[in-house]
């Protein structure tokens, strides 16, 4: 509880205790700063929270009375009742209430709820700030405003829609797929994105192709002595035909059709090795080398990226620091609350005048005038649904603390994130990277029978001025979010000798290399945030929580940094696509964000919009808001009975070599494979096989399916336990291979089981090893294979 001041005072309420302590120091006497610790009330989280007089209402389970203008039922959270009493006590002796919650919709809503619960009889002001520094707090306390009720209505509409969506659609998942699943306005769309990417991977057919790289040597005209320099070059043409590269193949493993591939040659392994051997005959000398036929030199310029907004901070922290989105936001919250950075939930790339001046001053101070861009750089957003209500994320204040000055003040993770933000902010006002790029084409005739005309190209880049890379170079993010490498300049700074048309080069070696085209990369947290941002789905403040939710619900698992969908996710997305198509449509979800923004701006009526969403509407102007015939209510009524649960949970993979359909069935106890074998002489036989959790959807090929079907469902018998006499089996389960004892039918007990070590193989594990695994004593004495890979 905040310290009691003598006499009257101004009561300031913020959201966190850390902020309260910091701001109390800045405001001093005459103010009491205390914390609400987030929301003090919300919609009921369960039946136990619903007041007795509402429990029998048909809308009580959602907490929203859809028949009374979508009136929400707000209840004070049980763990906030003591806090409410404390705030009311402090308010008794206050002569003014200042609501200083976060500067966004959520913060505006928290302020409104405080007003509704505390019912102050003194003047009320809204205080807004984007950084916690003495200057920012003094400015905010001087320039207060009224509560923005349009923002409050927009947040309430968003909360009601999310509650109706989740509480009405989730029970359909429970009945049709399995219990304890959930649907959500943004989480279901994010899950669909991940599932669609996996579908693309499953349908992808790889193509194989070869190319070769030669090492060439030639005199360097830039050298006073014309010293011979060695450099790499790639084979690009044979007999006038361009050598195929990965970009020339489609997702079915075939060369793309069109002009671009009309004169393309797919080099196979034999051809590549033959050409490599022939090229090594071009050792130089009269007519025995490669002639330079063109030299193209161009200036190279690279501009810095914009300062961080929430999404790009999450992406860069993932790519450079290997932080999850959730971890990044937790650390950023600490930095903000302790006054080190500006507000971290923003979709703006704009710096304030103070931020620009501070960044430019430190560029001069640390790197010199030549590294400062001559004029102020301005950055405009090009992403759907950007609000740009706040400044970009930057170090706080009008003079930034250097990372070195905070090394002993911040924890290791906080220091790393602060340094990243500081570097990015300074880089945004620095000079461009300057350099040159050079492409050299060389032609010759390989000594084959018959002779083969060939062409090679060598490319290189020279950085003549590092510009912003001086501060933001190491591990420089490509910001694609696709994990293709962190250093944007790596592999490109190849030094080429100065050459001119007519010069010759000798081949010193030639190395063929085989390649296979790859399916689209799975989403990582960074690339998912990037894709959601580009589609206009969700808001900066929601990305981390959405990713956390789909992980917690079991819709995705992480393999390294990649997000892999579970088979349950496939079933859930399939159900949503069949019965609630618009609710997982990317454009519809993005349009909802626009409409919620319109409510925040006072351009759309909250009640009219909610009614169109839930009940449907005939008004053409509202059709974008309607998720289907009869609105959400109509969709639930149509689909609760009509959707076929078995069909929803049956995913056709492919037909086996005999033309028999193979399905993945999503069962209550996990996914499994199933096919029905028919014969002329016997009844159909249904074959089933567990799908181990370690097998991802795109790895479940025909070959893998046959391997799983071949594992006996009853397991392989290893023999009998020497002490109990019970049969011991080795079986393959969804969590991997394990051994199990078989109890007599009359024994009601639970059989002992034990997982195999990763170094063990279910096909070769012995009875002795199984007995030791099942032993209740430590089995550290168990002799294991030496290769533990």
In which residue ranges do the predicted regions lie?
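Basic, low-complexity terminal or inter-domain segments flanking catalytic cores
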Residues: 2-3, 7-9, 21-22, 29, ...
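Amphipathic alpha-helical transducer elements in NTP-driven molecular machines
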Residues: 17-20, 30, 34-37, 77-91, ...
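C-terminal or mid-to-C-terminal helical accessory/interaction module adjacent to the motor/catalytic core
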Residues: 136-213
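C-terminal helical "lid" subdomain and adjoining coupling/linker elements of P-loop NTPases
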Residues: 195-266, 320
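C-terminal accessory/connector segments of nucleic-acid motor ATPases
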Residues: 205-223, 231, 294-325, 331, ...
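Metal- or metallocofactor-binding catalytic centers and their adjacent structured scaffolds
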Residues: 249-306, 500-503, 513
């Amino acid at each position: 509880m905040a310290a009691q001041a003598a006499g009257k005072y101004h009561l300031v309420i913020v959201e966190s205790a850390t902020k309260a302590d910091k701001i109390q120091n800045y405001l001093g006497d005459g103010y009491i700063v205390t914390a609400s610790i987030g929301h003090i009330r919300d919609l009921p989280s369960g039946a136990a929270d619903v007041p007795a007089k509402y429990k029998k209402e048909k809308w009580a389970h959602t907490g929203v009375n859809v028949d009374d203008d979508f009136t929400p039922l707000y209840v004070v959270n049980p763990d906030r009742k003591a806090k409410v009493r404390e705030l009311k006590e402090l308010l008794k002796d206050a002569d003014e209430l200042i609501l200083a919650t976060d500067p966004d919709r959520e913060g505006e809503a928290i302020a409104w709820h405080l007003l509704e619960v505390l019912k102050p009889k003194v003047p009320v002001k809204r205080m807004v700030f984007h950084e916690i520094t003495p200057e920012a707090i003094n400015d905010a306390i001087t320039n207060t405003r009224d509560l923005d009720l349009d923002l409050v209505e927009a947040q309430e509409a968003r909360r009601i829609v999310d509650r109706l969506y989740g509480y009405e659609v989730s029970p359909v998942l429970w009945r049709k797929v399995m219990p304890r699943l959930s649907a959500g306005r943004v989480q279901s769309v994010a899950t669909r994105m991940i599932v669609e990417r996996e579908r693309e991977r499953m349908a992808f057919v790889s193509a194989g192709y070869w190319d070769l790289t030669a090492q060439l040597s030639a005199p360097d005209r830039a050298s006073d002595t014309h010293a011979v320099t060695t450099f790499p070059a790639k084979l690009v043409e044979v007999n006038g035909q361009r050598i195929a590269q990965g970009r020339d193949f489609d997702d079915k493993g075939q060369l793309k059709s069109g002009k671009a591939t009309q004169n393309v040659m797919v080099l196979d392994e034999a051809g590549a090795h033959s050409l490599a051997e022939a090229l090594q005959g071009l050792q130089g000398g009269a007519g025995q080398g490669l002639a330079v036929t063109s030299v193209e030199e161009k200036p190279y310029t690279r501009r810095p990226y914009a300062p961080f907004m929430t999404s790009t901070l999450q992406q860069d922290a993932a790519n450079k620091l290997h932080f999850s989105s959730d971890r990044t936001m937790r650390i950023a919250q600490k930095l903000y609350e302790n006054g080190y950075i500006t507000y971290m939930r923003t979709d703006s790339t704009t710096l304030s005048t103070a931020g620009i001046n501070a960044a430019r001053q430190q560029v001069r101070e640390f790197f010199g005038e030549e590294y400062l861009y001559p004029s102020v750089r301005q950055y405009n957003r090009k992403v759907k649904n950007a609000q740009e209500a706040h400044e970009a994320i930057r170090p706080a204040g009008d003079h930034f603390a250097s990372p070195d000055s905070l090394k002993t003040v911040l924890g290791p993770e906080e220091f790393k994130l602060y340094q990243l933000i500081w570097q990015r902010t300074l880089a945004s006002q620095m000079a461009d990277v300057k350099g040159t790029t050079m492409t050299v084409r060389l032609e010759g005739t390989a000594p084959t029978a018959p002779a083969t005309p060939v062409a090679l190209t060598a490319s290189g880049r020279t950085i003549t001025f590092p510009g912003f890379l001086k501060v933001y170079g190491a591990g420089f993010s490509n910001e694609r979010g696709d994990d293709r490498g962190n250093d944007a300049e790596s592999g490109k700074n190849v030094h080429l000798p100065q050459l001119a048309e007519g010069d010759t080069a000798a081949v010193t070696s030639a190395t063929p290399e085989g390649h296979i085209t790859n399916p689209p990369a799975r989403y990582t947290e960074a690339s998912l945030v990037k894709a959601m941002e580009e589609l206009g789905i969700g808001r900066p403040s929601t990305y981390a929580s959405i990713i956390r939710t789909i992980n917690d619900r079991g819709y995705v698992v992480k393999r390294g940094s990649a997000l892999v969908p579970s088979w349950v996710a496939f079933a859930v997305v399939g159900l949503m696509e069949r019965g609630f198509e618009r609710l997982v449509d990317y454009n519809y979800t993005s349009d909802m964000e626009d409409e919620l923004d319109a409510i925040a701006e006072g351009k759309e009526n909250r009640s009219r919009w909610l009614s169109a969403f839930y009940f449907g509407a005939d008004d053409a102007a509202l059709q974008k808001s309607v998720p289907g015939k009869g609105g959400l209510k109509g969709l639930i009524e149509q689909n609760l009975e009509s959707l076929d649960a078995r069909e929803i949970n049956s995913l056709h993979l492919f037909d086996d070599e005999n033309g028999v359909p193979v399905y993945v069935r999503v069962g209550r106890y996990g996914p499994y494979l199933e096919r029905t074998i028919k014969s002329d002489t016997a009844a159909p036989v249904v074959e089933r096989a567990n799908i181990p959790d370690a097998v991802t959807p795109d790895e479940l090929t025909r070959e893998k399916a046959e391997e799983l079907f071949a594992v006996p469902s009853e397991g392989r018998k290893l023999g009998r336990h020497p002490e109990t006499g019970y049969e011991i089996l080795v079986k393959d389960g969804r969590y991997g291979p394990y051994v199990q004892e078989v109890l007599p039918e009359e024994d009601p007990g639970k059989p002992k089981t034990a997982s195999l070590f990763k170094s063990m193989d279910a096909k070769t594990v012995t009875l002795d090893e199984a007995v030791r695994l099942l032993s209740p004593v430590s089995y550290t004495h168990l002799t294991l294979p030496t290769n533990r890979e």
